[in-house]
Amino acid sequence: MTVKDAMTEVRRWLIVACHFVGPLIFFTNLTRNPYVTQIALIQAGVPLALAAWAWTEANRAEGWRLPRLPVTAPFLLFLCAWGASWLKAYLVDPVFFRPAILAEGARNGWFLLSVCASTFFLSSALASQDDGTTDVPLGGWTAFALIWGVLWFGFASARARTTGRPDDFWTLMWDPYGAFVWIVGLFGAVRLTRRGRVTDFLHLALCAGFLASAYGILQYFNLDLVWPYTLNPYGGRAVSTFGNPNFLSSFNVALMPVALALFLTEENGSRRLTYAALFLTLEAALLATLTRSSWGGAVIAFAALAASPRLRARARADSRTLGLLLGAGAAMALMWPSSTIATGYAPTFIGRLTEYAAIAKREGSYSPFHQRVLIWATAWLMGSESPLLGKGGGLFELFYPFYQGTMLHAYTFFHHMRTHANNSHNEILEVFSQTGLIGLGAFLAFWTAFFESVRRWAKGGAGQDPLWIGAAAGCVGVLADNMLNVSIHFAVPAFIFWWMAGVVMGRGGREGLRAAPWKAPALLRGAAFAGVALFAGLAAWGQVRFWEREAWYFAGFKYVRMADLAAAGRALERSRAWGPREVNALYELGNVYARAQQFDKAAASYREALDANAGYDEIYFNLATVYNADLGRSDDALKFYEVAWAINPLSVEAPNALSAFYLRSPEKYLEPALVVLREAVRDFPMNPNHWNNLGYALAQKKEWAEAEAAYTRALTIAPELGLAERNLAGLAATSGRPRAPILAVIGDMRALDAAVGARDFSDRTLKLAASIARRTPDSAKARFLYGSLLLSRGRTADAVPELEAAVAHETTRAAGRVNLGAAYQALGRQSDAAEQFAAALRLEPGNVQAQERLKALSAPK
């Protein structure tokens, strides 16, 4: 075997590893995310395979065979726009952010090059050089998938049950039986792809999709035959080997059109049956993910298939068989049951679709949709701030929290939808927010050229190839899916998407532009190969560092949970040493140092975390606390407290700490303190400390009536708050106003709280509650307690006006509405009751009582 042949084999092994091992290998107790190993494998494997391809091309006397693609110019333009936008951010944004801009830009830029660009180019190059044959030993593929899948059934009983320390990675990874199954699988996959054609690798992807889908379906119905415990990180949604249901769903959206196209064009009955079974398995797993954006993407992909004249002709010629398959698929969807591993919310396929009706309601919110509205609005703000070049390539996650904070300060509607978004959940806004109109223009030009070429080539030989047609439709489906999803920004779904896009361009390109040999001097070709090899080497070493960093971080995380701070510190320091900087690992290390009272080290680690990603409010808050309480750097502390509150006004601690800091020097910071506290009591109306601090600030401004009202509210919420009582009593002496009425009943309010806390619902307690409610008619708490006690006694009619008054005075608490709804229900006022339970859920979506009562009301009688 020549060196050239050897490199061809290396390339094939690497591509097999990416297609087969990449989607299927995962560890549940080794790294924070089970798909970390998948990321490392693909982000190293693809560049190495590209380098192996470059070696074979560099040694061809005829020159490099570079695919001539109609999308090359817009793709290069997009890369330039991405780089220019990042450079603009680095030079223009505050210097404080530069380390984080560098870190996030490098991380996302490397993904763009090593996964997206490299996969697309490698796939298109191989497809353009392919012989175009599509025959495969389908029986061999079927036998391989079934036998290899069955081998995993024995893992639960045959696996080694050794346990190791959190940092004993070999023990956590190694299992003799598992290794045996993987070796069998890898050699089987390599054997079946020995011809190295596009069709072989696509069938390998279909095989991996079938295995992952079958496992996901078993998970959904609580039949995990691999692990001895239930994997349920997403509330009953199937994750399979992907670690996230949205990744599996997009993977299947890419593959299902290929399976359907092969089914339609296959003549042999047994082979058609095989593709039909594959299609239905992929569909079942797609349903089990409960990912509606992917369901929509799949429908759009099937519509794209219908644009093929050949497939339409085949459908007309054998409409009965196609009807049976589509009928089976539709019936499965309509009858799809709830997951058996979900412990609470467990919708069916129909249930997930009917939830969309909540969007049309004038009142209330539907979090899955309105959270996206929040993200989209924030993405728009980011892009519109710098319309030409956007906020910076790869910097969405870094800057998103700051723009989201602006929205949260302004609109209480979005408060329970706050998130730390990695991406925008819409590819158009994703590109615009980061690279502006220039980048978006290049992005749209790329896909316009892509699909215009598909339309043109479909009239020729490519339009007769079911693999090519299916791959093109799969690209349509995944793009549609990612108008509401983020999956193509993660390694495995991104890899299959860009691989299929490359297949479409390279295989279709044989209809038009032929590969043009690059006959540069040998020295220049050697230099080009050296550049690709250097890129691949850096990618591989970078992924070794990435994997080690993640493994050591998770070991440290587990040691923290074991209360072994010394071991946690050592593990997290190892994580930092491997690098590159990672915000969560460095933040955890800072917390360990702080708990060990090594405050200088804690502050340094928190600063390093901000240098990795400066978008986390908790890091600013912890750093400010260390500066303020332990290092005596109060001026620095103030700046970081202010940023923490700007990013996240929904933190209970941030406004409390910031306002307390301001009120140390009211002559200097009184107005900022009032701004913070007025917003704090709006956002946390039941927090007595915020009301007490607001009262103090208002008293400093001599706004006596408002100060009295704030102190009174604090005592109404927490009668035991002695500081508020003393402040309110002192207010009367300072202002010359009469004593606040609540001071006369505060003792009785404390006694009532104590009685209710002790579950003393006696006549004496009821009488005390009635007395307090009469004396403080504007106290929502007093009216609520009295009404609730009346309700518990069966005096429903008497309870209603008390609870109505409580709800009128306190509009932000769910408890009053739940009890009022229960009272209405007892009186037969079903529609009024349903309205109150629905209102309670708008205020507190997780309120179990309201959920159960509303469900009972809507159940058929």
Region locations from a protein language model:
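Alpha-helical transmembrane segments of multi-pass inner-membrane proteins
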Residues: 2-28, 43-55, 76-87, 108-236, ...
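Interfacial juxtamembrane loops and adjacent helix segments
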Residues: 93-99, 164-166, 219, 224-239, ...
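Hydrophobic alpha-helical transmembrane segments in integral membrane proteins
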Residues: 336-351, 524-563
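Helix-start (N-cap) detector for alpha-helical repeat units in TPR-like alpha-solenoids
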Residues: 548-552, 583-584, 617-618, 652-653, ...
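Residue-level recognition of tetratricopeptide repeat
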Residues: 557, 591, 625-626, 660, ...
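Structural signature of tandem alpha-helical TPR/SEL1-like repeats
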Residues: 563-570, 596-608, 629-643, 664-679, ...
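Structural marker of alpha-solenoid helical repeat scaffolds
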Residues: 578, 612, 647, 683-684, ...
